[in-house]
Amino acid sequence: MTKFRGCIDIHSGQVKQIVGGTLTDSDADLKTNFVATQPPGYFAQLYKDNNVVGTHVIKLGPGCDEAAEEALAGWPDHLQIGGGINHDNAEKWIKLGASHVIVTSFLFPDAKLDMKRLTDLEAILEPYGGKKRIVVDLSCRRKDGKWVVAMNRWQTLTDTEVNKETLEQLAKHCDEFLIHAADVEGLCNGIDEELVTKLGEWLEEGHLPPVTYAGGAKNIDDLALVQKLSHGKVDLTYGSALDVFGGDKVKFSDCVEWNEKMHK
């Protein structure tokens, strides 16, 4: 059954909601929907109090480690951490209280998928559960009617398509997938229905781990839409539309109520 999953996006040490396609090395290009006055720990506590499991904390660029550590400390062993994760720092983040590390760019040196990097990471984390601690982020952009994994803050397209074969290949070495539809991220103009439908089909056909979709969710009905399109196989994250992130389209309390109602 489709669940609401939370997010805490951190940029320059603050919790923010941004337009995904505008995240580059230059802050001049950045389009921001929301900058929180509350610290990251406030949002961690909010998710904890409402039992929004599987929430992810994403570090968007440098200067975010301290804020991310504060978030993890707010709900130890329950929040996933992503952004700049590699084999040198993954163990540190697990020790700091992350339930999972989320990896993207590290797996794609020179924009090409390197499976050895994933298996090496799995081996490093073996004392903590190995693959059960890894989420692979296959954030993607549309190209020629397909979805191509995008890295480097979603600016660089890789050689890897998001499809059933890719999911099956990676599933042997991870516990979950996180998929941001970067083209619609932060726009609140609706989810990529075609991608969600396909994800549901691929998950139904193969023995694949859970998938969380993020990007474009604009009203509470999107939870029911994702449930229908994916046959309950895909979970949904809300960002800029949520009232706790300054949005006026979706109430956080309604999302929590959905989880309680659907998962009694």
Curated annotation (Swiss-Prot):
Q: What is its main location?
A: cytoplasm
Enzyme Commission (EC) number: 5.3.1.16
Q: Among the entry's GO cellular component annotations, what is one? A: cytoplasm
Stated name of the protein: 1-(5-phosphoribosyl)-5-[(5-phosphoribosylamino)methylideneamino] imidazole-4-carboxamide isomerase
Which InterPro entries does this UniProt record tie to the protein?
Answer: Aldolase_TIM, His6-like_euk, His_biosynth, Isoase_HisA-like, RibuloseP-bd_barrel
- Which family is this protein grouped under? Belongs to the HisA/HisF family.
Which superkingdom, per the lineage? Eukaryota
Catalysed reactions, semicolon-separated: 1-(5-phospho-beta-D-ribosyl)-5-[(5-phospho-beta-D-ribosylamino)methylideneamino]imidazole-4-carboxamide = 5-[(5-phospho-1-deoxy-D-ribulos-1-ylimino)methylamino]-1-(5-phospho-beta-D-ribosyl)imidazole-4-carboxamide
Q: To which pathway does this protein belong?
A: Amino-acid biosynthesis; L-histidine biosynthesis; L-histidine from 5-phospho-alpha-D-ribose 1-diphosphate: step 4/9
